Amino acid sequence: MNIQIHRGQNQIGGNIIEISTETTKIVLDVGLELDDDKNQELPDIDGLFDFAGYDAVFISHYHGDHLGLAYYVHKDIPIFIGEDSYKIISASDNYKNIETFKPKGFLNHKKSITVGDITVTPYLCDHSAFDSYMLLCEADGEKVLYTGDFRSNGRKPYNWLLKELPKNIDALLCEGTTLSREGYVSQTESELEQEAVELFKTNTGPVFVLQSSMNIDRIVTMYRAAKRTSRIFLEELYMAEITSAIGGSIPNPYFSDVYTFITNPKRYETLSQYDHKVGKDFISKSHFVMCVRNSMLSYLKSLSEKMSFKNGLLVYSFWSGYKENDEMKEFLNECENLGLKIVTLHTSGHADETAIKELIGTVKPKKLIPIHTENAERFKELVPDVVVEIEDCN
């Protein structure tokens, strides 16, 4: 079994990994590069975009740096992805009037899929993207495990995953996003929730949370904090469409204490399907936590004319690097001008050093290939007894 990393070893994001035998070729993830513009050219990989030269594509999760090029994969190449992942990306695309790619099938925990002479087994893992998977590839008597993106600090028990994973594998392709941050230790979502509770109690005014509408764990965290401080939870229509697509125990518009609102009147027809739909009059008289996006500045200004933002709070719950974005800077500055106190509450969607070492110690690879990292050399220090393969392949 051969491994070729077309992209993603000495950088964060943009993963495209080829696994092949003499008769079968598959790809694990087809990601956009994080630092490129939206008009980036397709990678020059024969048979992936121009014709059907591969037997399948497997997508670990729905973040753009792992899935973004799936829309351009040749239509005759089957794509596999988690079912809830697909529901989320479909809801997002539908809201934006984008046509979603059609998968051949769905990934499920420990349900193997055989393509040619390669068998792929997904393992459900925790990440800031809901329904993420590690992928075990087996062929020619060898086992290769691709971690995708993972963490130990979410709401899924990490020990459960470690018990489920295969042992004594031939090669581990392991992400190391956080290895550039020396001494970094991930805060848990539960710890984040408790911090949010204290903030929501201390700041008696309205609370706005700036976070990704696709970060389901963070939605759960903020919903639980709202519930514990007797605040209603407000989801703008885009988030509501995503959470309702998953349903179940995820806070969604069908919960009695979750309310949905719109910032664009043209969206009212879509909003009307939900029972708990509200407007500014209701919101202005309520004690709430509202999830917002940085495109909602004019809406917040309009809302501030109907209610006081005194003792109000804006919780910034993204990676800190996004604060350098011009649009984000403007949004945060204007929120301060509206009288909101800005507080950062965020934790990484990626494993810290301790979690990475635990994983490596559990699966016991013969060799380790770093991916999704800007500090691949750190793996040699973390696990000196494991062969670490680093190639300049970008």
Predicted regions and their residues:
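Short, charged/polar "capping" segments at the starts of alpha-helices
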Residues: 36, 86-90, 217, 240-245, ...
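Active-site regions of enzymes building and remodeling cell-envelope glycoconjugates
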Residues: 76-79, 98-107, 120, 253-261, ...
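Hard-cation-handling environments
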Residues: 185-311, 371
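C-terminal regulatory/interaction regions
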Residues: 11, 228, 265-394
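Generic beta-strand/beta-sheet core signal
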Residues: 29, 82, 147, 175, ...
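Gly/Ser/Thr-rich loops at beta-strand to alpha-helix junctions
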Residues: 10-11, 63-65, 126-130, 152, ...
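His/Asp/Glu-rich metal-coordinating catalytic cores
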Residues: 1-58, 64-217, 221-224, 228, ...
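Short connector loops at secondary-structure junctions
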Residues: 31, 177-182, 238-249, 346-355
